C-alpha cells in the first residue's frame, strides 16, 4: 500500500473561514475518491467530536489518505490534512501547514474573504505552499463568483484566473479540485537517503494504546519495529505499530519521505509527544530537529470550581484526562474563600475556554462555576522585580508596585462599510487605538486597531457580531506589553472579600464597573435577617456601595396599646440580636449571583 513513488504523492490542506464549507468539501473529496463507502458516510466525517458536529467547527486536526486516478491514467495518493479555522487554534493550523506542500483556499462565493481566511493564507504563504483558490457554494442564489475573484486578487494578491468554482453540497466541481491538486501541488522532495526526520502535527490520547501521534515523514523512512527518539522532549520509545489514515487506521510496515501516517508507542501523555516536535531514529538520529517548533502559550485564564465541593477530585481527574489530549491546556490548584477548592486554568482563547468547559460538563458530568476570564499582567515592583500575574486576586498592593503592563493585540476587523461607525465606537469603548482603515472593495472595509487583550477576551466577539448582524469577522495577534493606569477592583459582601469577583480594570472605568457590580448583586442576593452592605473598593477606598435591607419580624404584634417602654424593650432586644447576627452571620451567595455577575464583569 505504501510503495508509492514520491512523484505521485500530494500533501495538501484546506484553508477556510468558519462556515465556508471546509468540512463539507472534505466529505465530498472522501466520497469522490471512494475512500469512504457511501453507506458509512456522515456529514462532517472528519469532525469526530460530538461538540465539533454540534457547533459546526473543526477543533482537533484530522488527516485522511485518498487514492485518485488522474486524467494521465496514473494513480496518485493524496493526503488531506483537515485544519481548524478558528483564531484560537491557529497554532494547530500552522503546524498542519508545515506538513503540506499545497493548500485549497476555500472562499464562500456569497460572503467573500473573511479575517480568518486571511490569517491562515499568510501562514500558508510563509510556508511556501502552492495555493489553489476554490469558490464554494456557487449554487446559492446570492453567490457572485466574479466579484469574489476580484476580491481575492485585490486583498491577497493571488491569481484567480484558474480558480475553481464548486459546490461541496451538490458535488459540482469536486473532480476539478482533485485534478488541480495533482497538477498544481508539487510532490514532496525526495529525501529518502537522508537521516530520518518526521514532524508531529497532531496527537490524541487513546485509553487503550496510549498517545496516537500523527506525523509526516520529511526525510528518510520509519518502519514498524524501529526505536524512535523525540528530539524536543529527549524521550525514546519502541514502536508498537505505524500506519496510515484512510481515514480509518490501517497498519503498514514502513512509511518513507513525503508520507503521512500515525504511530503508537505506548506514550503516556500528549505532553511527551509535543506537536511540532521532530521524530528521528534512536540508533541513527538526525543532526538537527526540524525548524519552527514553538510551544503553545495560554493567553486567557480563569478559575474553574465545582458547584459541589465533593466533585473536586472528579474535576482534577477530568482535567488530567483532558490534558492528555489537549497539550495547550494548563491548570494548577487554587482556593477561594467564596468558592472553595478549584483550579486556575490557562487557555489559548475564549473559544478554547468554552470548549474545555463544555467538554468537562458533558464528557465528565461535572457542574462548574467559571470565573471571569483574565489575561497575564506584568507587574513591575519597586524593588526592580517583574512579576507575571494571571489571577487578579494575587495582584500586589499599590505601595509595593511601580507600574502594571498589560498585553496588547493588533486587531483587524473585516466588515461591510455600513457598519463602520458602530465598529469604531465599539473599539473606542474598549480602549482601542486607531491605526488604519482600508477599503478592500467599494463596499467592504478593513479596520485596524491596537487594543488591550483584556478587552478582547470578554465579549468583544459577541458584541462585534451583534452590532454588524453577523457580517463582521476579526483576527488578532499579540504585539507586546504596554503600561497603563490599571487598578484592582475588589467586591466586599458583608465586609468579606469575594475573590472570584475581583477584576483588574482601567482607573477610568473602575467607578462604572464597581457601580454595576454592586447593583447587580443587590438584585441577586436574597435578603437575610440582618442588613448586608455590598461594596466595591480600590485598595481601602470604597467607590460604590449598596445595602440589602434586613428581613424584620414584627415583635410588637402582641402589644396592643400598652406602655411605650415595653415596646422599646422588645425593639432593643431585637436590635441586639440582629447586631450579634451581623457579626457572626455568613452570607451565602447563590451560584446564580456569581454567574450573572461574572457575565456582567465580562
Swiss-Prot record:
GO MF annotations, alphabetized: GTP binding; GTPase activity; ribosome binding
Domain tr-type G: 7-189
Cited InterPro entries: EF-4, EFG_III/V, EFG_V-like, EFTu-like_2, G_TR_CS, GUFP, LepA_C_sf, LepA_CTD
Pfam annotation, one family: GTP_EFTU_D2
Alphabetized UniProt keyword annotations: Cell inner membrane, Cell membrane, GTP-binding, Hydrolase, Membrane, Nucleotide-binding, Protein biosynthesis
Catalytic activity field: GTP + H2O = GDP + phosphate + H(+)
Gene Ontology biological process terms from the UniProt entry: positive regulation of translation; translation
CDD domains, alphabetized: EF4_II, EF4_III, LepA, lepA_C
EC number: 3.6.5.n1
Keyword hit for Disulfide bond: no
Classification via NCBIfam families: lepA, small_GTP
Similarity section: Belongs to the TRAFAC class translation factor GTPase superfamily. Classic translation factor GTPase family. LepA subfamily.
Role played: Required for accurate and efficient protein synthesis under certain stress conditions. May act as a fidelity factor of the translation reaction, by catalyzing a one-codon backward translocation of tRNAs on improperly translocated ribosomes. Back-translocation proceeds from a post-translocation (POST) complex to a pre-translocation (PRE) complex, thus giving elongation factor G a second chance to translocate the tRNAs correctly. Binds to ribosomes in a GTP-dependent manner.
Name of the protein this chain belongs to: Elongation factor 4
Gene: lepA
Amino acid at each position: 500500500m505504501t510503495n508509492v513513488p514520491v512523484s505521485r504523492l500530494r500533501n495538501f490542506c484546506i484553508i477556510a473561514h468558519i462556515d465556508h464549507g471546509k468540512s463539507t468539501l472534505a466529505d465530498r473529496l472522501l466520497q469522490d475518491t471512494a475512500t469512504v463507502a457511501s453507506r458509512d458516510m456522515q456529514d462532517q466525517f472528519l469532525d469526530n467530536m460530538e461538540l465539533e458536529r454540534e457547533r459546526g467547527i473543526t477543533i482537533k486536526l484530522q488527516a485522511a489518505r485518498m487514492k485518485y486516478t488522474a486524467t494521465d491514467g496514473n494513480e496518485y495518493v493524496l493526503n488531506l490534512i483537515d485544519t481548524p479555522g478558528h483564531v484560537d487554534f491557529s497554532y494547530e493550523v500552522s503546524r498542519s501547514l508545515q506538513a503540506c506542500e499545497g493548500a485549497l483556499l476555500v472562499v464562500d462565493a456569497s460572503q467573500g474573504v473573511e479575517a480568518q481566511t486571511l490569517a491562515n493564507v499568510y501562514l500558508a504563504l510563509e510556508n511556501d505552499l502552492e495555493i489553489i483558490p476554490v469558490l464554494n457554494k456557487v449554487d446559492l442564489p446570492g453567490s457572485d463568483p466574479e466579484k469574489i475573484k476580484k476580491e481575492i486578487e485585490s486583498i491577497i494578491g493571488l491569481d484567480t484566473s484558474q480558480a475553481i468554482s464548486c459546490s461541496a453540497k451538490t458535488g459540482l466541481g469536486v473532480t476539478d479540485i482533485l485534478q488541480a491538486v495533482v497538477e498544481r501541488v508539487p510532490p514532496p522532495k525526495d529525501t529518502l537517503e537522508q537521516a530520518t526526520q518526521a514532524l508531529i502535527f497532531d496527537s490524541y490520547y487513546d485509553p487503550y494504546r496510549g498517545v496516537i501521534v500523527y506525523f509526516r515523514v520529511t526525510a528518510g523512512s520509519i518502519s514498524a519495529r524501529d526505536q524512535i527518539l523525540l528530539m524536543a522532549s529527549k524521550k525514546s520509545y519502541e514502536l508498537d505499530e505505524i500506519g496510515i489514515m484512510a481515514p480509518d487506521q490501517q497498519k503498514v510496515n514502513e512509511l518513507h519521505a513525503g508520507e503521512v501516517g500515525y504511530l503508537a508507542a505506548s506514550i503516556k501523555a500528549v505532553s511527551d509527544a509535543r506537536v511540532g516536535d521532530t521524530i528521528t531514529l534512536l540508533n541513527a538520529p538526525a543532526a538537527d530537529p526540524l525548524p519552527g517548533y514553538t510551544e503553545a502559550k495560554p493567553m486567557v485564564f480563569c478559575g474553574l470550581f465545582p458547584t459541589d465541593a465533593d466533585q473536586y477530585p472528579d474535576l482534577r481527574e477530568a482535567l488530567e484526562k483532558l490534558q492528555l489530549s489537549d497539550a495547550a491546556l494548563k491548570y494548577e490548584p487554587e482556593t477561594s474563600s467564596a468558592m472553595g477548592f478549584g483550579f486556575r486554568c490557562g487557555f489559548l482563547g475564549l473559544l478554547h475556554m468554552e470548549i474545555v468547559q463544555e467538554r468537562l460538563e458533558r464528557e465528565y458530568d461535572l457542574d462548574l462555576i467559571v470565573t471571569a476570564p483574565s489575561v497575564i499582567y506584568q507587574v513591575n515592583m519597586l524593588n526592580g522585580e517583574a512579576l507575571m500575574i494571571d489571577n487578579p486576586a494575587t495582584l500586589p498592593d499599590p505601595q509595593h508596585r511601580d507600574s502594571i503592563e498589560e498585553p496588547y493585540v493588533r486587531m483587524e476587523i473585516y466588515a461591510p462599510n455600513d457598519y463602520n461607525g458602530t465598529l469604531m465606537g465599539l473599539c473606542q469603548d474598549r480602549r482601542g487605538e486607531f491605526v488604519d482603515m482600508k477599503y478592500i472593495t467599494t463596499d467592504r472595509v478593513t479596520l485596524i486597531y491596537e487594543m488591550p487583550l483584556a478587552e478582547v477576551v470578554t465579549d468583544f466577539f459577541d458584541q462585534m457580531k451583534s452590532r454588524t448582524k453577523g457580517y463582521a469577522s476579526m483576527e488578532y495577534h499579540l504585539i507586546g506589553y504596554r503600561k497603563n493606569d490599571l487598578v484592582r477592583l475588589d467586591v466586599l459582601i458583608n465586609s468579606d472579600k469575594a475573590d472570584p469577583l475581583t477584576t483588574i480594570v482601567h482607573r477610568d472605568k473602575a467607578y462604572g464597573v464597581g457601580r454595576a457590580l454592586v447593583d447587580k448583586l443587590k438584585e441577586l442576593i436574597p435578603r437575610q435577617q440582618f442588613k448586608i452592605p455590598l461594596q466595591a473598593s480600590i485598595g481601602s477606598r470604597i467607590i460604590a456601595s449598596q445595602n440589602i435591607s434586613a428581613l424584620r419580624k414584627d415583635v410588637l404584634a402582641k402589644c396592643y396599646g400598652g406602655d411605650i417602654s415595653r415596646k422599646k424593650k422588645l425593639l432593643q432586644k431585637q436590635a441586639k440580636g440582629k447586631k450579634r447576627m451581623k457579626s457572626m452571620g455568613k452570607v451565602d451567595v447563590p451560584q446564580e449571583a456569581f454567574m450573572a455577575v461574572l457575565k456582567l464583569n465580562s
